Amino acid sequence: MRVKGIKKNYQHLWRWGGMMLLGILMICSATDKLWVTVYYGVPVWKEANTTLFCASDAKAYDTEIHNVWATHACVPTDPNPQELVMGNVTENFNMWKNDMVEQMHEDIISLWDQSLKPCVKLTPLCVTLNCHDFNATNATSNSGKMMEGGEMKNCSFNITTSIRDKMQKEYALFYKLDIVPIDNDKTNTRYRLISCNTSVITQACPKVTFEPIPIHYCAPAGFAILKCNNKKFNGTGPCTNVSTVQCTHGIRPVVSTQLLLNGSLAEEEVVIRSENFTNNVKTIIVQLNESVEINCTRPNNNTRKRITMGPGRVYYTTGQIIGDIRRAHCNLSRSKWENTLKQIVTKLRVQFKNKTIVFNRSSGGDPEIVMHSFNCGGEFFFCNTTQLFNSTWYRNTTGNITEGNSPITLPCRIKQIINMWQEVGKAMYAPPIRGQIKCSSNITGLLLTRDGGNNNETTDTEIFRPGGGNMRDNWRSELYKYKVVKIEPLGVAPTKAKRRVVQREKRAVGLGALFLGFLGAAGSTMGAASLTLTVQARLLLSGIVQQQNNLLMAIEAQQHMLELTVWGIKQLQARVLAVERYLKDQQLLGIWGCSGKLICTTAVPWNASWSNKSLSDIWDNMTWMEWEREIDNYTNLIYSLIEDSQIQQEKNEKELLELDKWASLWNWFNITNWLWYIKIFIMIVGGLIGLRIVFAVLSIVNRVRQGYSPLSFQTRLPGRRGPDRPEGIEEEGGERDRDRSSPLVDGFLALFWVDLRSLFLFSYHRLRDLLLIVTRIVELLGRRGWEVLKYWWNLLQYWSQELKNSAVSLLNATAIAVGERTDRAIEVVQRAFRAILHIPRRIRQGLERALQ
């Protein structure tokens, strides 16, 4: 028997040992499976082209004068602009392929066109002009240089009056640049306006000003503007010092050629930028590190007169010039300019292998290209820059720098008919400005072109000439350090977490389209950035809402206009675009079952073909931008798999939940499940112990009420009997005393039943007593409450009657008093009336007495 028992125990141990070994092998052979996890609010962006809107300082312009840039339609600038530096981020920039430049160019053209729409067309002036040289009537000698002969013409012409079928002869002064002689005229007295045969000339409205006002370009919600802060950035290639801003700096839309005015300066050295230095067709943009002040003036004291050209159309022209006809000119410091050229030459020699650098005048073309053209106080100046670009800088020399502080004086001419943006068919007439004109500007850059074809190794000289004419280069000189990116807040990455419970998630607070606040974590690793998703997402919806309010206020400010400006249209587009981005992201999150979540696990397994990097390599060493580039080709595939998985979960919710519990043996050893098991075990044991204690206490209380204390909670020993008292016989005869104990109870179930029965009886009696007490209390409170209510009701009736009686008495007394006073007043009136009636009688009686 002993041998059999040992054999049986050994077989039992062998069976359990085999099962444990099999389980250990299964656990050890199981590998960690990775699953796709969705992250919302990751610092990821992609290059994009979007509609930008403008911001401008509300105090930067005169409300009574309409500036051509329509900055009154822009949103107000942020008094505390935020610039967020992104550490450990390298981004590629390309100033030559920047959509911001194209957009600004189109905006400025549209603004000019729109500002001229309501203005007068000068088509009636396209007639024959009989002109002769103009001379001042009261000339006086002065130190200013006289205008060249024939620079201004006094022309007469026939024009329609306010009555259309009548003509009258008018006189006007024109600049020589604005008129051309008629071909068949040999006397040079017959002219026409220069653009009449090619363009429609529009006169600028009287209250339009061309003064450049800083314009800030801003990105709508869901987009951001990246800024390169490298001090020597050449405009193309990687930038290691990157920050994100909501708006650009204030860019003055200065329309000029050859020289860039009132722009931004380089922080350290002069910087030259070109799309391709070896290609002479490409313009070279020079950014100075120190500005050179240039002061321009038109000394002529002009007057302005009006000429009516039919009903509702007025043409403004120069009336008379008081004093000498002196030419306009600009002055700048010679030493500063030559020092600027010296720094430019140093940079050019680096690009062109230490060759001789020659600066020469423009090679020819339109006046806008040949001369430095710009707007000064409302007049368009065309200045000869030959003195600025007329020097040779030999190799290993400092050039022919002129000693002395004498200023450089540039002779300027004025042109009133401007070919707008070198476009065919559009010309503008700038009305003359009264009085003298002075303006001061800062030269902050140059536009240069290089002679020759491709870079020739055999030549030792490079010739550079002033260029311009393409206004895109003007805007490019300011926008070179910016680029627009589209925020991609949705990111996917592998984790060990899998979506376990398939249920409808509770909707959390909505998060809006991504704003720039979260980009501060762009340079952090994926693991570090994912820990701050909540902080990164706080400004998302608040940012879009605030921006929407600002845009709406700017749009409402334009309701008095018949049509929106270019900025108004852009603001509407920005509003719609921001809402679209927000709805698109929320739609994807809803389709994936991730609404309101920053981190959302899925049931889609991670495919190693997408990326075979380990979790530590991904989360500890890579940024979100690097990871996005890693899986960019598979993003759409992953999105579709997540969507398919969510659809399958919704179709088979119950079945998938049941199967998921038995997905792998490892779920049995999940720490969360074991903690739940331990919690249930502790609750059961604690409940049994507590129940046992309650039963013991109830038993003790019951026994104490019977007059003695038992030795045990359940086993009660019989009371001692006297020696003369028999214990009974086999037939259970004999006498039983009262103090004899009841039979003992054996077994757990019997003990449990006795205790449970005692508990229920005790609870029943106590609850019955409590119910009786509560019933008595409620009855007593009800009776007392009813008595109190009756007392208050009687009291209310009593005081109501008293108040009623008092009111009646007061009303009666008031009526009696009023009646008495009314009677007295009537009596007084009657007496007065009788007295008046008796006046004739008294007079008669008096006369009778007097006559007697």
From Swiss-Prot:
The keyword Manganese does not apply. GO terms for molecular function: structural molecule activity. Keywords: AIDS, Apoptosis, Clathrin-mediated endocytosis of virus by host, Cleavage on pair of basic residues, Coiled coil, Disulfide bond, Fusion of virus membrane with host endosomal membrane, Fusion of virus membrane with host membrane, Glycoprotein, Host cell membrane, Host endosome, Host membrane, Host-virus interaction, Lipoprotein, Membrane, Palmitate, Signal, Transmembrane, Transmembrane helix, Viral attachment to host cell, Viral envelope protein, Viral immunoevasion, Viral penetration into host cytoplasm, Virion, Virus endocytosis by host, Virus entry into host cell. Residues 508-528 are annotated as: Fusion peptide. One of its GO terms (biological process) is positive regulation of receptor clustering. Disulfide bonds join C54-C74, C119-C205, C126-C196, C131-C155, C218-C247, C228-C239, C296-C330, C376-C439, C383-C412, C594-C600. Belongs to the HIV-1 env protein family. This is Envelope glycoprotein gp160. The lineage of its organism: Viruses, Riboviria, Pararnavirae, Artverviricota, Revtraviricetes. The gene is env.
